[in-house]
Amino acid sequence: MSLKIGIAGPVGSGKTSLIESLTNLLKDKYSLGIVTNDIYTTEDANYLKKTLDLDNERIIGVETGGCPHTAIRDDISMNQKAVVELEEKFNPDIVFVESGGDNLSATFSYELIDYYIYVIDVAQGADIPRKKGAGLLFSDLLIVNKTDLAPYVEIDLVDMQIDVKENRKNKPYVFISKKEPQTLNQVVSWIEALI
């Protein structure tokens, strides 16, 4: 049975890029599978197939045809089918399930995944942690992404971290940037602790 990790967050927060980075960091040690969700295309899956050194059959794109969080929370049948297909064919250690870009209320059904990560980015605004969406409050790990952009959008990362800590209570969170690859080690450590 695979460890299934959901990854949700608003459009453009860096979900696909996170999966790309994590796959590159984990693929030599673990067997991986990826399921992506888009409303009318398989754009994210196609991107990952082009950029990753991973068998294309290990990446499945789901076209939800509607509201992104419905496919990961309410009617999970298309995603479950994709996960089962990966498990039967490859028996992966880890399957990443990426939701389509959504608002702050995205949550996963725990019938689909074991744990989920919620991704926000600093360019979305300093007030995002204070808006207390379900993804931000209840995800198993919150990632504040694109910290390298903070100076350009006039975000004080210290203040943002205070807001995140206050709203997350005792739940884990990390601040990362693809431009600072060592920050991704925190996410890798979190995942490896679950295996």
Curated annotation (Swiss-Prot):
GO process annotations (BP): urea catabolic process
Single GO term (MF): GTP binding
Protein name: Urease accessory protein UreG
Places the protein is found: Cytoplasm
Family in the record: Belongs to the SIMIBI class G3E GTPase family. UreG subfamily.
Predominant cellular place of this UniProt entry's protein: cytoplasm
Keywords in alphabetical order: Chaperone, Cytoplasm, GTP-binding, Nickel insertion, Nucleotide-binding
Function statement: Facilitates the functional incorporation of the urease nickel metallocenter. This process requires GTP hydrolysis, probably effectuated by UreG.
Pfam families for this protein: cobW
InterPro entries cross-referenced by the UniProt entry: CobW/HypB/UreG_nucleotide-bd (IPR003495), P-loop_NTPase (IPR027417), UreG (IPR004400)
Assembly and oligomerization: Homodimer. UreD, UreF and UreG form a complex that acts as a GTP-hydrolysis-dependent molecular chaperone, activating the urease apoprotein by helping to assemble the nickel containing metallocenter of UreC. The UreE protein probably delivers the nickel.
Positions of GTP binding: G9, P10, V11, G12, S13, G14, K15, T16
The organism's place on the tree of life at top rank: Bacteria
Example of a GO cellular component annotation carried by this entry: cytoplasm
